[in-house]
Amino acid sequence: MADWSLLPNDLLELIVGHLETSFEIVLFRSVCRSWRSVVPPLDHSRCLGIKTHDISFNAGFTFSDQPTDQPPFKSSVDCTLKNIPIYLVKFWTPYGDDYLIAEMREREGGEPKLLLSPLSSNRIIYGMGINKVLFNSLTSPIIPFGQYYEITYFKKQPIRYRYGLPYHLWNEVEWVETSERVEFLRLHSEDSRDFAVLFAGRMCNLVMYRSRNMSWTQVVEHPETYAYQDLVAFKGKFYALDSSGRGRVFVVELSLRVTEIPSVKGSQYCSKESLVQLGEELLLVQRFIPAGRRYDEYIYTWFKVFRLDEEGGKRKWVQVNYLNDRVIFLGARTKLCCSVHKLPGANENCIVFLASNDGSIFDNDSVLLFDLKTRRTNTAFNECKGYMGVFGANLKSLVSCGLVTIPNPTTRFLL
């Protein structure tokens, strides 16, 4: 095995020149002492930034399929593409090895990073009611685990009733900041800056942004106008899954050509579907609830998993009954899939998902687990404590090793 500490300084300085955020510098400095000597410590007041791109809106463009003469956006430059990183933090406690999976967000005024659960829609904040969550990158490995992209922009929205707002203003409009999940595809170019973005939101049409043209373009719709419930960038193309519940997936090429992958044979209607990427594989995951059952009756929930087969140049879905040592996490804004060897105490061949249809987490019973081998569904934390770190529910471990500090009740102000 190569000794990374022996790399020459000029090569290390070249690597540092390609780091895009200060958090990447923190990770670089955590490798070994010789690497830390190349880059001075960061000022603690400095924000650990995330990667962003400014995206312009072409004149008359809207995210609907109808052009308009009225500017639908506050400014032609008020759209920002953000890369949201997800990290796996490993640590050691008196109870054994443990981990935390966290999405990191900006906060204003140079405050510490905000740690969120990447899988919940109600934006569970790690450290809520707790003074600090401290990571020592020298003793707790911080490993890039995943990422997703979103665009943030201002749009017009009718003013809803507010306490104290005069009645005659209720029909007025206001500019509201909006964030939407998108898929990002980096393209090959000389300066490595060319990219494409695909966006669906809650619409029945797709729009694509090309950095080379600096404009958005409507993608031709397929004949049946279902909304799209999931998008993924895979092997230089976009894949869009509609909400028909029949496993209908469309391949969207950069030329705006759209082709449909033959639906899963004999597929029955499912309540929810997701596209999950694992390395060089693309998975279609279908969730079923028998007719007449409610979402909260999780014991009746079951899943099917299919792998995209591209052999012979023809795409088709092949059912998968075993995930080997892997586990799939289905969240509200992102999906993750990895080997359980990366997650201490986790069970393999499972799908971890959320009980509510909107991806909200209210308590530990909101997180469920489906075992592909036994075909049983149970609450995840009762079935396997190793999944608590995915949702920050392992507070006892976090406190025991000093990553989390609990407020001193004698010095805390009560409001």
UniProtKB/Swiss-Prot annotation:
InterPro entries noted in UniProt: F-box-like_dom_sf, F-box_dom, Gal_Oxase/kelch_b-propeller, KIB1-4_b-propeller, SCF_F-box_domain
Annotated disulfide bonds: none
Alphabetical list of SUPFAM superfamilies matching this protein: F-box domain, Galactose oxidase, central domain
Coiled-coil regions listed: none
Domain F-box, first and last residues per copy: 2-50
Gene3D superfamilies, A to Z: 1.20.1280.50
Protein name from the UniProt record: Putative F-box protein At2g16290
Organism from which the protein derives: Arabidopsis thaliana
